[in-house]
Amino acid sequence: MAKVIGIDLGTTNSCVAVMDGKNAKVIENAEGARTTPSIIAFTDGDERLAGQPAKRQAVTNPEGTLFAVKRLIGRRYDDPMVTKDKDLVPYKIVKGDNGDAWVEVHGKKYSPSQISAMILQKMKETAESYLGETVTQAVITVPAYFNDAQRQATKDAGKIAGLEVLRIINEPTAAALAYGLDKSEGKTIAVYDLGGGTFDVSVLEIGDGVFEVKSTNGDTFLGGEDFDIRLVEYLVAEFKKESGIDLKNDKLALQRLKEAAEKAKIELSSSQQTEINLPFITADQTGPKHLAIKLSRAKFESLVDDLVQRTVEPCKAALKDAGLKAGEIDEVVLVGGMTRMPKIQEVVKAFFGKEPHKGVNPDEVVAMGAAIQGGVLQGDVKDVLLLDVTPLSLGIETLGGVFTRLIERNTTIPTKKSQTFSTAEDNQSAVTIRVFQGEREMAADNKLLGQFDLVGIPPAPRGVPQIEVTFDIDANGIVNVSAKDKGTGKEHQIRIQASGGLTDADIEKMVKDAEANAEADKKRRESVEAKNQAESLVHSTEKSLAEYGDKVSADDKKAIEDAIAALKTSLEGEDAEDIKAKTQALAEVSMKLGQAMYEAAQAAEGAGAEGGEQASSSKDDVVDADYEEIDDNKKSS
C-alpha cells in the first residue's frame, strides 16, 4: 500500500515526513537538508528552481525569486495585508483575473496556489526519492487561523501538484499529535506556533490517544518575515544616516539586506551581538559603499518588541474561549523557528507562568504530526482520535447588513447546523444567501466566502416563506452551504468557492501546466545529464588520442577526430537526442583506441614480467639473508 506523506507547507521553509513503523520520520531533500526553503525562482532562461538552489541565486535575481507566497494564498488583491506586502517584496504582486492576489514573473501570472504547488512538488519528489515509489496522497498542514478561502487554496495547490489531499490539518494540532502520541496521562497543553509568516495558539486536552482542541486563535500575517522586514528597515535607515543613500528602491541591495537580516536574527538567538558586513552594497560618484553595522540582541529586541507583544492577545483569547486560566495549562509546546528567539521564550514564560517545553524540534514537529495523521487515515496508527475546531464563526448576512452566526468559532468539526429564515419583502421570489466568516457584528466587516441565489419562491407576504439555511463544515474546515424553501422543497447547495478562488477549470489547467513543467524539467535534466556524459567522453577520448594516437591507423584516428568534432558541435545546441546519438557514435569509433591501449598495456606487462624473473634469480642470496635476519630477531627477543 502506497505511503501517505505529511507535508508542512511553511511560509519560509517546508518539511516532509512519513510514518516509518510506529514513528514519524523526517525525510532529507536532495541537498541533504531536513527542511526546504519555500522559494521558487524563474531564471532568465526560464528555468524553474525550487528550494535551496532558488534561495542561492535570489541576490542576483530578486524579481524572479518568489518567497513567502503563502502570505498571499486565498487573499484578495485589495486586502490591506496584500497592499502592505506589495511594498516589501522585490517581486510583482498583481491582480488575478478573479480578483485574488497573484504574482507575475517575466510577464507571466501565477496564482499563489500554483507557486505553492511547485513547492509541494519538490516535497513530493523528496519523499519519492526516499521511498522509491510514487506518492499520490498527502496530509498538508495550514495555520489554525486560516479561513475557508485559504484552506481551499491550499487544497487546490495539492491538487495542482498531483496529490490527493486526504486532510488539511491545523499546524498546532499536528504539533500536538507529534508531541503527545506516546503520552498516556491526561494533560492540557497550549501550542504556541510562531513560524515564518503566521502565528497560531491552540489549547488542547490530550490523553489516551484523544486530542481535543478546546480553542484556537492567531494572526495570519505575523511571523519571522515581519521580524526580518523590521531589521531591514533599520539597516536602510542607518545606512542612509551614514551615507545619505537610500537603498529602499535598490532591489538587489534589498535582497542582500534581507539575507543578512535573516542571518543576523538567527545568530542573535545564541549570541549577544553580531556584525552585519555587506561590502559594495551600492556606489555613487565617490566610489563603492560598504555597509558595516554592529547589532546587539537588546537593540534587535527593541526593534521587534511590538511584534513579540502582538502574540499575547491571541493567547489571552484562546484561554478565554477554552474557559481556562494560564495556571491551568500543564505544558506549553513551542513550534516554529521564531520560538528559538530568547525574547519570545521570555514572553511565553511570563504569560503562562512556566518554562516552555523544548523537547520537540520546532522546524520538524508539524510535518511529523501531519505524517501521523496520514498514518491514522491509512489505518497504520491505531487508537488516535483527533477533534479539531473551526477557528472563525460562520454565518450569513441578514436584514440591515447584520452578521447572523450559525456556527460559533471553536466549534468541534466536522459539524452541521441549520437555521430557518424568511423573506424581507412581500412577494419576494428569490433570496441571495451571502456567506461570511469572522467575528465582527456587521457582515461587511467580515470575510465574504461566497454567495448564491435561491430562486422560485412562491409569492407570499414577507415573513411567511420558510427558508432553511444549513452550514456543513468537513474535517478539513472547508464549508458547504445549502438553502431550502420548506414550502416547495426547492434546494440550492454550494461548496463555498471563495469570492475569488480557483474554478475547477482553472485548477485543471494548472494541473496540466504543472505536468508539462515536470516534463520540461525532466527533459532539461536529461539534457544536462547527456551533456555531462558527452563532455566527459570527449575529454577522456582526446586524452587517450594524444597518448595512444600513434597506435591506431590513420583512418581510425581521423574517424575518431571527426566524431569528436561532431559531438562538440552537437554540444553547442540543446538537442538531447542528437547529443546522445553523437556520444554513442564516438563511443563506437573510439573502441579501436581502447583496443590499442589494451594491447600496449599487455605488452608492457609482458616485458615487466620477464624483467622480474631475471631480477628474482639474481637476488636469491638476499632473500636468504632476509630469513636469517628474522631468525636473529627471534633469538634476541
UniProtKB/Swiss-Prot annotation:
One Pfam family named in its UniProt record: HSP70
Cited InterPro entries: ATPase_NBD, Chaperone_DnaK, Heat_shock_70_CS, HSP70_C_sf, HSP70_peptide-bd_sf, Hsp_70_fam
UniProt record similarity statement: Belongs to the heat shock protein 70 family.
Induction statement: By stress conditions e.g. heat shock.
Composition bias, Low complexity: 601-617
Residues that bear Phosphothreonine: 198
Species of origin: Brucella suis biovar 1 (strain 1330)
Record GO terms (molecular function): ATP binding; ATP-dependent protein folding chaperone; unfolded protein binding
Protein name stated in the entry: Chaperone protein DnaK
Domain of life: Bacteria
UniProt entry keywords in alphabetical sequence: ATP-binding, Chaperone, Nucleotide-binding, Phosphoprotein, Stress response
Protein purpose: Acts as a chaperone.
Family annotation (HAMAP family): DnaK
Residue ranges, compositional bias (Basic and acidic residues): 514-529
The keyword Transmembrane appears for this protein: no
Region (Disordered): 514-542, 601-637
